[in-house]
From Swiss-Prot:
Pfam families attached to this UniProt entry: Toxin_12
Organism: Pelinobius muticus (King baboon spider)
Residue positions assigned to the propeptide: 22-45
Function, in words: Omega-conotoxins act at presynaptic membranes, they bind and block voltage-gated calcium channels (Cav). This toxin inhibits barium currents (IBa) mediated by L-type voltage-gated calcium channels Cav1.2/CACNA1C (IC(50)=825 nM) and Cav1.3/CACNA1C (IC(50)=2240 nM).
Subcellular location: Secreted
Record InterPro entries: Huwentoxin-1
Top-rank taxon: Eukaryota
SUPFAM superfamilies attached to this UniProt entry: omega toxin-like (SSF57059)
Organism ancestry: Eukaryota, Metazoa, Ecdysozoa, Arthropoda, Chelicerata
Protein name per the record: Omega-theraphotoxin-Pm1a
Free-text comment on this protein's domains from its UniProt entry: The presence of a 'disulfide through disulfide knot' structurally defines this protein as a knottin.
Membership in a protein family: Belongs to the neurotoxin 10 (Hwtx-1) family. 41 (Jztx-36) subfamily.
Tissues where the protein occurs: Expressed by the venom gland.
Cystine pairings recorded for this chain: C52-C66, C59-C71, C65-C78
Length: 84
């Protein structure tokens, strides 16, 4: 009984990995295109904007904060702007 359970718990993940690897080998260009699109999207959003203030960092205006953050005027700190 223990041997059969062990075989099931080893065989199922192994089958999943082999199937996923076969699918990716069948369509390698899709994976490359997806990665290229992801890098372009990050560049457009300014994810790596230099000198930006992170969450709860002090700021003078919203342009000082990193993407998806805005300067809150009450105490002049960067907080989430509500965007997705």
């Amino acid at each position: 009984m223990k041997t059969s359970m062990l075989a099931v718990f080893v065989a199922l993940p192994l089958a999943f990995v082999l199937t996923a690897a076969t699918e990716e080998r069948a369509h390698p260009n899709e994976l490359v295109n997806s990665l290229v699109e992801l890098v372009k999207l990050d560049a457009e959003r300014g994810v790596d904007k230099e000198g930006c203030k992170y969450m709860f960092g002090s700021c003078g205006k919203s342009d000082d904060c990193c993407p998806k953050l805005a300067c809150k005027r009450t105490f002049n700190y960067c907080a989430w702007d509500g965007s997705v």
